[in-house]
């Protein structure tokens, strides 16, 4: 040990009271060494824990469940986009029914403007959905005042003609039994069912007879009786009738039908050439057992009245 070091050690008591010497060395080492005594000279303030009061939890209102704490959504893999289903080509029944009802109301307003005055006839025309009796491709034309094809060279009569013939047959009366010659698609029989107690209808073309049954089935009309047969012969088993409506034109009214008309009854029929020229809507009233009165009214166009069945 050198003489200088020997003088420094052991230290006297007064030497221990002196301030410690600064450490010698490189500047960086002196700075780092000096930082430790400063931190040690003054102890760091100790933070007291702050008492956190729990948030007041409100009791849930009666009838309302307490809300669950929100949780972070779990990441999910994106699903491939599915193609949207194609829209149905047919409108929903409820929506189309409303649309049909509105256009029927407009049709009835036109009928009233054209001279149909019997409220029962107008109500019957408003009640029957004509679009159900035509081909789907013609449904948009169902409430126009025009005749439309129904197949087998037959047509459904114009609404104005149907209303006019029924109003003439009624003449303000309440009808009991009505006979229709030429059922066709069943539309006129459906309208008649609203103004008469019993409706009998005859069709000579078997496919149309079957079609009329299908058309009328959804309407659940209980007072229509369809028959497949020769309309010129009528239906003697159900006679006499308060009214007879013929939906085809003959050169004259068959005598068998005149005989099946009740006294005081009315028959309405188009009469004229089979070609459709010079056809006239004719009213025949039976005034006595062997007496009928005839009135010629409007120009019309109907398919020909034929005999036999096919």
Swiss-Prot record:
Domain of life of the organism encoding this protein: Bacteria
Region entry Disordered, spans: 1-44, 67-88
Enzyme class, broadest EC rank: transferase
Location of the protein in the cell: Cytoplasm
Protein EC: 2.1.1.77
GO BP annotations listed: methylation; protein modification process; protein repair
Coiled coil regions, renumbered to chain: none
Gene3D superfamilies tied to this protein: Vaccinia Virus protein VP39
Active site residues according to the UniProt entry: 157
Stretches with biased composition (Pro residues): 75-86
Gene Ontology molecular function, alphabetical: protein-L-isoaspartate (D-aspartate) O-methyltransferase activity
Pfam family, one: PCMT
Principal location listed in the UniProt entry: cytoplasm
Regions of compositional bias (Low complexity) in chain numbering: 32-44
Ranges of biased composition (kind: Basic and acidic residues): 14-29
Catalytic activity: [protein]-L-isoaspartate + S-adenosyl-L-methionine = [protein]-L-isoaspartate alpha-methyl ester + S-adenosyl-L-homocysteine
GO cellular component, one term: cytoplasm
Sorted UniProt keywords: Cytoplasm, Methyltransferase, S-adenosyl-L-methionine, Transferase
PANTHER family given in the database record: PROTEIN-L-ISOASPARTATE O-METHYLTRANSFERASE, PROTEIN-L-ISOASPARTATE(D-ASPARTATE) O-METHYLTRANSFERASE
Purpose: Catalyzes the methyl esterification of L-isoaspartyl residues in peptides and proteins that result from spontaneous decomposition of normal L-aspartyl and L-asparaginyl residues. It plays a role in the repair and/or degradation of damaged proteins.
Family, per entry: Belongs to the methyltransferase superfamily. L-isoaspartyl/D-aspartyl protein methyltransferase family.
Identification of the protein by name: Protein-L-isoaspartate O-methyltransferase
Source organism (scientific name): Burkholderia orbicola (strain MC0-3)
Lineage: Bacteria, Pseudomonadati, Pseudomonadota, Betaproteobacteria, Burkholderiales
């Amino acid at each position: 040990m050198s003489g200088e070091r020997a003088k420094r050690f052991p230290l006297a008591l007064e030497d221990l009271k002196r301030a410690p010497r600064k450490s010698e060395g490189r500047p960086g080492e002196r700075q780092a060494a000096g930082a430790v005594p400063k931190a040690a000279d003054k102890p760091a303030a100790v933070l007291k824990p702050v008492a956190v009061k729990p948030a007041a939890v409100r009791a849930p209102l009666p009838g309302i469940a307490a809300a669950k704490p929100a949780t972070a959504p779990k990441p999910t893999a994106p699903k491939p986009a599915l193609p949207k289903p194609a829209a149905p080509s047919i409108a929903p029944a409820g929506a189309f029914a409303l649309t049909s009802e509105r256009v029927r109301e407009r049709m009835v307003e036109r009928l009233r403007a054209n001279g149909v005055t019997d409220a029962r006839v107008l109500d019957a025309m408003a009640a029957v959905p004509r679009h159900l009796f035509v081909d789907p491709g013609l449904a948009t034309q169902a409430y126009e005042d025009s005749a439309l094809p129904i197949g087998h060279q037959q047509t459904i009569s114009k609404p104005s003609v149907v209303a006019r013939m029924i109003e003439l047959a009624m003449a303000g009366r309440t009808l009991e039994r009505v006979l229709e010659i030429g059922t066709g698609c069943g539309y006129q029989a459906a309208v008649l069912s609203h103004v008469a107690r019993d409706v009998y209808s005859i069709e000579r073309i078997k496919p149309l007879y079957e079609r009329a049954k299908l058309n009328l089935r959804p309407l659940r009309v209980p007072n229509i009786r369809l028959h497949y047969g020769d309309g010129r012969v009528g239906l003697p088993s159900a006679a006499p009738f308060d009214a007879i409506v013929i939906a085809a034109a003959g050169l004259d009214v068959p005598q068998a039908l005149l005989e099946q008309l009740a006294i005081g009854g009315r028959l309405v029929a188009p009469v004229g050439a089979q070609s459709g020229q010079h056809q006239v809507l004719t009213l025949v009233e039976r005034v006595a057992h062997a007496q009928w009165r005839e009135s010629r009214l409007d120009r019309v166009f109907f398919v020909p009245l034929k005999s036999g069945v096919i």
